[in-house]
Amino acid sequence: MAKSEGRWWIWGAWLTIGVGVVGFGIVLFTLYGINLGPISHEHAAWSSFGSLLSGFFMVASTGATVATLLFLAHQNKQIQKTNIEQQRVTNAQLAAMNFEQYVNHRRFFMERLNELQSMFGNTFVFENRDALYNKVFPKNTPTNLEFKAEVVTDPGSQNYLGALNLHLSVLRNYAKSPSGKDDGRWLVGKLINLSEALDLRMVNEVAEGDLEFKGQRTPLNIYGADEFVMVATAIYDSFMFYTGNDKAERLIFPMGRSANDSLMKYFLGREEYPEIVKVLKPLPGLEMLERIYFDLCGIETEHFGYLEPLYAQLMEIFSSPTGVQKLRNNVYIADLLETGRRCTAKALARSEKGADDYNKLKVISEDLDILIALK
């Protein structure tokens, strides 16, 4: 409708200008003819007529120019309207395309989280997936999509990926030089920081050594600190791949016994702030076995040789959560306690009463008797 009205308007302008020019010419030449009279043979008269004719054609050309300019102005206005409409349509198409890409990007991210859960036997789930996506890609919205994300480790502007990087770096440095670092509280704090950043909710069966923080079970087990760091590194590497960054540096040396022993010592007999952080030990007598394990380290070499079979077995047990799970087997633990009782009896027989080693061995022997009675 608007196009039709515009077309009629321009044709009306052309017709008005044309009729005006023709009418003006008729009136002009009629008046000139009346005043000039019969055809004159005078040069001045024809000169005046030529000037008149020239002036008329100038007016006619001016009218044509004005009409052309009006037409071009109208055409330009129509082109601008068309361009604006096309731009609006293009913007709408781009917005729809960007939104679709955003939705697909989020879906692929969620699918990757499912793959990570399956990779580790569905022992955990990511607690808040939407919040996790927004932390990994803080600039992404339905109207803006970025496939890469920076890893900012500077304390003043640190982002989520930068925080994960720093948590893992601290633990890598610990693994490189664990000697002399017997501060279990420090290690617990670093591991909990990493656990909280990942925001995982455990859905597997409770195991001996699982750590609870603020009433929620974490993916950390005090008998398998390395296993937790391995899971955390795999998750971080997945984020790095998805955001177009390099993977994390690998743990060249595992934290191993140093980490497990530090965590066990820290929680052994610890009772302060149980509502904040505590270790789940549903197996009866587990703490007593831990105490025997550490007491054996204080026995002098001359007597330790008799206890070595017991110590080696306990060291293997406390090296991983799987090892501790063996203690649920009644036959296995009965054999362990019998081995311990026999080794301790040999060491006691060769130790002088009242000696430091004798007293330590006596405590170990009594603890073993209590454990045997429990079974």
Label each residue range with its predicted role:
Residues 1-74, 81, 99, 103-151, ...:
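Short hydrophobic membrane-inserting helices
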Residues 81-375:
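Amphipathic alpha-helical "stem/stalk" segments
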